[in-house]
């Protein structure tokens, strides 16, 4: 485990890897990193606390010893630290929520630097606001900004992909209704950041409505 401030470039940086969800993202990323055919050859983790990141790396590596991953210090409230991250990777995976409170500076830094961005957000207002604010800059810089790469969206996306492959020829459905069922031997619980995101989303639903009314309507798919 290497705590560092400056240095090389990485295929992927996971921001917020010590958080509740970030630890699981890190655990899955380590599986890809250890696969010979994986395109991921170098990973770094970033956040406010090197100590917590070190603990997260140890947890995510169990039962194996933790690999020697660079640990970078960054804070969503510090734009210069975010710019530093973007300069060191082609892909930043953001796990710091609630995104309405912490996500906008990260998207802004990626869009300006031409760094590709992924997150696990399920917050419509955040996603639509950053699209409105940074779409043109991201296009000019060649940055892909992709939100909702988490449980809120991925199961439904996989279901739609599976459904679409069942149709033959030019036939295609114009609507898909998806249902998700969960099975687990353990009790299903949520974490505080997820709860906070939901509460803030409901409390500020009127702001999302105002945003949508202020934006030009997109044409419906034909």
Label for each model-derived stretch:
Residues 1-9, 36-38, 62-64:
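Eukaryotic N-terminal low-complexity, Ser/Thr- and Lys/Arg-rich leader segments
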Residues 7-34:
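N-terminal Rossmann NAD(P)H-binding glycine-rich loop of SDR-like oxidoreductase domains
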Residues 41-45:
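Conserved beta-strand positions in the Rossmann-like core of class I SAM-dependent methyltransferases
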Residues 46-50, 75-76:
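N-terminal Rossmann-fold cofactor-binding loop
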Residues 70-102:
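Conserved Rossmann-fold cofactor-binding substructure of NAD(P)-dependent oxidoreductases
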Residues 98, 107-127:
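ADP-ribose/adenylate-binding Rossmann-like module
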Residues 103, 121-143:
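Rossmann-fold NAD(P)-binding glycine/threonine-rich loop
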Residues 165-222:
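Active-site-lining helix/loop region of Rossmann-like oxidoreductase modules
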């Amino acid at each position: 485990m290497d705590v560092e401030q400056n240095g090389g470039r990485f295929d992927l940086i996971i921001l917020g890897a010590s958080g509740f969800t970030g630890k699981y993202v890190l655990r899955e990323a380590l599986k890809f990193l250890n696969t010979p055919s994986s395109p991921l050859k170098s990973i770094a983790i970033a956040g406010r606390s090197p100590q917590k990141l070190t603990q997260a790396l140890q947890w995510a590596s169990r039962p194996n010893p933790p690999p020697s991953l660079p640990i970078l210090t960054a804070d969503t409230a510090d734009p210069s630290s975010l710019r530093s991250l973007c300069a060191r990777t082609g892909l930043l995976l953001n796990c710091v929520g609630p995104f309405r409170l912490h996500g906008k500076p990260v998207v802004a830094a990626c869009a300006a630097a031409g760094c590709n961005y992924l997150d696990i957000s399920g917050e419509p207002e955040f996603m639509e606001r950053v699209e409105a604010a940074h779409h043109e800059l991201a296009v000019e810089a060649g940055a892909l900004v992709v939100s909702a790469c988490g449980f809120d969206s991925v199961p439904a996306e996989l279901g739609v992909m599976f459904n679409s492959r069942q149709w033959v020829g030019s036939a295609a459905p114009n609507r898909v209704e998806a249902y998700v069922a969960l099975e687990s031997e353990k009790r299903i619980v949520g974490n505080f950041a997820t709860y906070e995101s939901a509460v803030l989303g409901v409390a500020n639903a009127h702001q999302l409505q105002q945003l949508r009314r202020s934006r030009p309507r997109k044409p419906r798919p034909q």
